[in-house]
């Protein structure tokens, strides 16, 4: 999937994958992973997710990485918050207190960039990628985060003949194939999305969809 695909989606406001509110599963299940702590959080392929403000409001330093400059700017403008902008290579950094969005290619991150990270929140990264890119995404993620980093992962599964992603369908079995060798995986929720759910109706999912929530801890 080329960079231009995502730049075009953001430029044309074709962002049906964006949630305009805090994700309910984050709200419900984050304490299971993070407890009452305020460890630093990495949000890959973060877009302009409101979830980052929710995490920041609970004391977590945030590093998000996002390819689209439009998304980075919108994130702060829509919250009516100012960010300092620091151009650089391979990332331009948008900063507001200890909330940062790094604008650039996720695959350019190196371990030193995330050495202080202890938590990862992935609601829209794995499911944003087509099947042929997911192994590379996971391999890179597990290579750049510290070994004691814990992950909250949210996935979506549906009949792929009914809808063309993104978001793409990711089965529970695929999560275990991608992460199972190195991580203890706990599926904390699996819930069917009703056929009359606005997202399912908008995208033509006549058979609905299934959402899953996982916590991952290094073995």
Swiss-Prot record:
Residues passing through the membrane, by range: none
GO cellular component: cytoplasm
EC number: 2.1.1.67
A Pfam family this chain is assigned to: TPMT
Catalytic function, reaction form: S-adenosyl-L-methionine + a thiopurine = S-adenosyl-L-homocysteine + a thiopurine S-methylether
Homology family: Belongs to the class I-like SAM-binding methyltransferase superfamily. TPMT family.
A molecular function GO annotation: thiopurine S-methyltransferase activity
Protein origin, superkingdom: Bacteria
Entry keyword set: Cytoplasm, Methyltransferase, S-adenosyl-L-methionine, Transferase
Residues given in the record as S-adenosyl-L-methionine binding sites: 10, 45, 66, 123
InterPro entries: SAM-dependent_MTases_sf, Thiopur_S-MeTfrase_Se/Te_detox, Thiopurine_S-MeTrfase, TPMT
Location within or outside the cell: Cytoplasm
One GO-annotated biological process of the protein: response to metal ion
Record's protein name: Thiopurine S-methyltransferase
Top enzyme category: transferase
Protein encoded by which gene: tpm
């Amino acid at each position: 999937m080329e960079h231009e695909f995502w730049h075009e989606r953001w430029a044309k406001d074709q962002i049906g994958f964006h949630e305009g509110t805090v994700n309910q599963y984050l709200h419900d299940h984050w304490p299971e992973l993070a407890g009452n702590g305020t460890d630093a959080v990495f949000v890959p392929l973060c877009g302009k997710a409101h979830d980052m403000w929710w995490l920041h409001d609970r004391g977590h330093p945030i590093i998000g990485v996002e390819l689209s400059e439009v998304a980075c700017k919108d994130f702060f403008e829509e919250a009516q918050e100012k960010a300092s902008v620091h151009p650089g290579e391979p990332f331009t950094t948008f900063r507001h207190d200890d909330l940062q969005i790094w604008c650039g290619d996720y695959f350019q991150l190196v371990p030193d960039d995330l050495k202080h990270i202890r938590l990862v929140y992935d609601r829209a990264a794995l499911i944003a990628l087509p099947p042929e890119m997911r192994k590379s995404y996971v391999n890179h993620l597990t290579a750049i985060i510290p070994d004691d980093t814990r992950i909250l992962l949210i996935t979506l599964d549906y009949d792929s003949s009914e809808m063309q992603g993104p978001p793409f369908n990711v089965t529970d079995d695929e999560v275990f194939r991608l992460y199972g060798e190195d991580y203890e995986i706990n599926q904390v929720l699996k819930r069917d999305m009703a056929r009359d759910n606005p997202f399912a109706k908008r995208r033509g999912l006549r058979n609905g969809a299934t959402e899953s929530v996982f916590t991952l801890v290094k073995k």
